[in-house]
Amino acid sequence: MIISAASDYRAAAQRTLPPFLFHYIDGGAYAEYTLRRNVEDLSQVALRQRVLKNMSDLSLETTLFNETLSMPVALAPVGLCGMYARRGEVQAAAAADAKGIPFTLSTVSVCPIEEVAPTLKRPMWFQLYVLRDRGFMRNALERAKAAGCSTLVFTVDMPTPGARYRDAHSGMSGPNAAMRRYWQAVMHPKWAWDVGLNGRPHDLGNISAYLGKPTGLEDYIGWLANNFDPSISWKDLEWIREFWDGPMVIKGILDPEDARDAVRFGADGIVVSNHGGRQLDGVLSSARALPAIADAVKGDIAILADSGIRNGLDVVRMIALGADTVLLGRAYLYALATAGKAGVANLLDLIEKEMKVAMTLTGAKSISEISGDSLVQELGKSLPAALAPMSKGDAT
């Protein structure tokens, strides 16, 4: 199979993975309206083509939180990453490390902090949820700090799990889910051998280390469902600061006022994100939300963005809309499931090449030269008909 884009990796991953795993990462909340809009809105951001600009000294390098990145991209935290390839977090982190960009380990990773961090040359980032069990949160923060993690990504858009219809249909949840997953694995022998048998243990490593006992998929679903904390508030940031003195990024911002609050409460960065369309359907796409947020806080706080990014052109679009750096989620999971570390490394090479093409043809020699001036029109200020506000009929 010829691989020339993230879409090719998606097609390959769908063939390789048991359906419960493919649809877990591929799906979104409710009718998946926001999931689709993330991609569609971003694809309609028009860039100004500029020519005869002597682009021979083009550079993608940037700096974030005193770290030098080879390009303005980081790998996002993804739960159960180690179910998509054998010790998947270790493989994905190695690809990011070799490329000179950060890898973010999820709270609910298969591989624990202590397994991933020692394999890397550069410090990784760690993602944390607000959970009812504050003892676990403190333990995770202390372990992340001891392992040399440089940046904390604090996810705030999951006070409760989203309603993900696909999960019930695919076998991730719902009636007879464990039996359905078993038979799906049997029907996908490549995955069953590489990950199902040789990728053990399939614990949630960070949680198992705290609880002192193995945790499987059913524990993952049950433990998280019982521990997400709807009482989360901005004061939780103050509590976290007692145990974390490094850069802290608030992930899950879609409103300018929340972005301003993040500045007021001392966050170092925000991620403009709707959780890849996996939490509340019908909210703004990240591309649509980003310009107003950038207008509100650009220069006061680092702005990262995710959701809908599938190629290097999308990275340039997000930066033109106001982001400093982007996070890749689904795209790298597809590559990881298809070819492990080599797949992620190849995807990052493709994104780098695509960014260079886009920057060359828009006359931007450096990341700092990509701005609103690079746009034909800024998304959300002069919307074409396809991006008009959702009507009542669209919501049904």
From Swiss-Prot:
Top-level lineage group: Bacteria
Keyword Ribosomal protein: no
Annotated ranges, domain FMN hydroxy acid dehydrogenase: 1-380
Disulfide bond entries: none
Keywords: Cell inner membrane, Cell membrane, Flavoprotein, FMN, Membrane, Oxidoreductase
Cofactors, names only: FMN
Reactions catalysed: (S)-lactate + A = pyruvate + AH2
Intracellular or extracellular location(s): Cell inner membrane
GO molecular function, one term: FMN binding
Ligand binding (substrate): 24, 129, 164, 278
Any single GO BP term: aerobic respiration
Active site location: 275 (proton acceptor)
Annotated positions binding FMN: 106, 127, 155, 251, 306-330
Leader peptide range in chain numbering: none
Record's bilayer topology term: Peripheral membrane protein
InterPro entries: Aldolase_TIM, Alpha-hydoxy_acid_DH_FMN, FMN-dep_DH, FMN_HAD, FMN_hydac_DH_AS, LldD
GO CC term (a single one): plasma membrane
Predominant subcellular localization, coarse grouping: membrane
Record family assignment: Belongs to the FMN-dependent alpha-hydroxy acid dehydrogenase family.
Described purpose of this protein according to its UniProt entry: Catalyzes the conversion of L-lactate to pyruvate. Is coupled to the respiratory chain.
NCBIfam families listed in its UniProt record: L_lactate_LldD, PRK11197.1
UniProt-recorded name of the protein: L-lactate dehydrogenase
